[in-house]
Amino acid sequence: MRSATKILAALLLLAPLAVRAQEVRVQTADPVLRGLKQSDFPRLKQLEPNVYAYEELRPSDPGKFKTTVDMIVVTSGGVLVADGQGNPGATEKLVARIKSLTPLPIKYVVVCSEHEDHTGGNVAFKAAFPDVVFVASPVSQKALAASATPPTEAVADKRIIHLGATDIEVLNQGRAHTGGDLSVYLPGAKVLFMSEIYDHRLFPSLARGFPSEWLSTIKKNQAIDAKWVFGGHGFVDDPATMKHELAAFAAELTAVIAEGRRLHDAGVACRSAKDCDAVRVANWGPYENWSERVTQAPGALMRVYQEIEGKLPK
């Protein structure tokens, strides 16, 4: 009895610590506002059996951090990873975490976003698993052709990868954040990874994006029968929240495009992201405090102006 009392007392002492360490579920991409520390990362979230989201921190606005998120699919025939991290050290941590889940090799890495914060560490995949296959869109394949890990397979529309007993759909739904964004969908588990097509609670990074096409691509992904939907930045919450937040991200992108059109029609100049009078008078309304607004707004306005003027790449 005395021993049981001591155990209970110890648990009661630990309880406040557990409460203090608990994540605060506020809708923000800022880990600090969620009550999280750098030491809380990287972290793995199981979405469905053998399907995971992996969150790691990277520098964001000055003095701040944001997550870069990957998808991990473990099958009886090996592992598929969608997106990597921004440097070899961070990707080595990702590989180590995967090795703790399964002794099976990583067979495929799908490059959903060609940008360095998702591909800069891809050499770590190759070092750990020399036979790994990198898959990308034709646009991203060309962009990464001179890299140390050039994609050898391209998806122009849709490809089904049969890995073990699992079917994995790699989808090219159109241009969005880049010219070659991909999504990965598991029809069996109903999990959809949208990479940088969906940045949870971040101001849209449009400097190399395609404003109206991005909205169209989001809508195509929203039409997919998915329980889980998550993206390449921000946090992964419960399924209902993630769907609601995808709609919120689409609404934000719509508002950014509308504000850019208003300023363009008013004759306010935005010659480049570094020379943009429009950003100083823009009204972002409820999106004023979304993460990275200060750094991303000039490029977003520039890109909306280019779309209006027919100057976007074909």
Q: What is the predicted function of each stretch?
A:
Residues 1-8:
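Bacterial N-terminal signal peptides that target proteins for export
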Residues 17-21:
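Sec/Tat signal peptide C-region and signal peptidase I cleavage site
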Residues 22-34, 223-225, 237-314:
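Accessory terminal helices/loops
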Residues 31, 41, 46, 78-80, 86-88, 137-255, ...:
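Metallo-beta-lactamase
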Residues 46-97, 182-186, 190-194:
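Conserved beta-strand hairpin/beta-sheet module of binuclear metal-dependent hydrolase folds
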Residues 50, 73, 83, 98, ...:
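Divalent metal-coordination and catalytic microenvironments
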Residues 92, 96-162:
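Active-site HxH/HxHxD metal-binding segment of metal-dependent hydrolases
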